[in-house]
Amino acid sequence: SLGVNARTVAVCGFLVTAILSVATGTSWGTFAACAPIFLWLNHILGGSILLTTASIAGGACFGDNIGLISDTTVVSSGIQKVEVLERVKSQVVWSVACLVVSAIIIYGMSIAMQLPTEVANTAIAIDSIPTEAWSAIEAQKPAAVELLNQVKEGVPFYMVIPLLLVIIAAVLGMPTLLCLFLGICSSFILGSFAGTVESLGSFLGLVESGFSEAGSWVIVMMMWFGAFGGIMSKMNAFEPLSKFILKISRNVRQLMFWNGLLCIGGNAALSDEMAQIVTIGPITKELVDKNVEGSEEDIYKLRLRNATFSSALGVFGSQLIPWHVYIGFYVGILSSVYPLHTFIATDIIKYNVMAFVTVGSLLLLTLTGWDRFIPNFGLPREPKVKLKNQTSDVNSDKEICA
């Protein structure tokens, strides 16, 4: 209702998809729902199609990295044996900082491109979507059609309250299930007033389908992790790789940095962020558990970082890999809903500010130790944590001197 112009459509799309992805816990569904709106709105306004496309792609990944009901968040936390809520609390400041920095850069790029400043609104953009695009959206993500209709008709601003309640409850340290319960109850109450909820039965049906869609994937991946991890452990299949990483790591911080690069490498090799999480996750966990000495609290913080590596470098790292299934899905959706442009993988990659900021900052902060300036995000410093081979070397030197 406020209207956007060509200079703000990309950053607005970025922020809207980021918020929506946290609420839904899915980047794919968020992208499928928002791409038609912002691509056609961008078309009407005369904005940059590539910047807008990459911005909504990056924003849609935000919830998959920090959402309480995101499958990548849940699975990566489970593999590292950390609580989802603790995981989110440890990285929320860094994640939001990446969001803010990316939004500023995207808006700066829009200004640098000298884009027009005429104003339009989303209702006009939705009316401009051709019939063929509607059919493609319904085939890929049927729920996105309902969301588009709600956006066209208008949804009251107070419907953001359930999302805010979930975030506040999580920050206060409430259990994950209680956070979700608050969000579900408030959504039903406010949705009844807003007209987005028809009845209790239909609402419970939506909740059930949402949990079953997300939960089924989590269960399958955790079963795969259990079977795959057990077999690989008995075969010592990861031992050569683990020994190599230990050999080139001079301290714990370097070990964690290489864990991050290992996640990116696994993501590129497997072309699937979930496959990377369940394949590389056990390796990074074992590297920390078997080779780092420290208090239980400090080791737990290292596991939290490993979990962040798995999902953040899995989801956002996928945005920088041309052959990744994420990019393939995005290109397929884009080609269906906006046939006026021929999209290729590099279109999404080169303008995806959020992906570059998130991946780059996570690795840089880990390696340099600058993560200590971010609340709850800093890794324990030496001598609180040490590599076990360093401890053995020190003990050997003491014995020789004696």
Language-model features, listed with the residues they occupy:
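Hydrophobic transmembrane alpha-helices of multi-pass solute/ion transporters
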Residues: 1-8, 144-155, 160-227, 240-244, ...
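Inter-helical loop and helix-membrane interface segments of multi-pass membrane transporters/permeases
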Residues: 1-8, 46-52, 113-153, 194-209, ...
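Hydrophobic alpha-helical transmembrane segments of multi-pass integral membrane proteins
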Residues: 5-37, 245-287, 310-311
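Alpha-helical transmembrane segments of multi-pass membrane proteins
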Residues: 7-19, 46-62, 254-267, 293-323, ...
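Hydrophobic core segments of alpha-helical transmembrane domains in multi-pass membrane transport
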Residues: 13-21, 96-110, 158-172, 181-191, ...
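Short helix-coil transition sites and intra-membrane helix breaks within transmembrane domains
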Residues: 20-33, 61-70, 216-218, 229-240, ...
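Juxtamembrane helix-boundary/capping and inter-helix hinge elements in multi-pass membrane proteins
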Residues: 46-50, 75-88, 234-237, 249-251, ...
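Juxtamembrane and boundary regions of transmembrane helices in multi-pass small-molecule transporters
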Residues: 65-68, 77-143, 276, 317-402
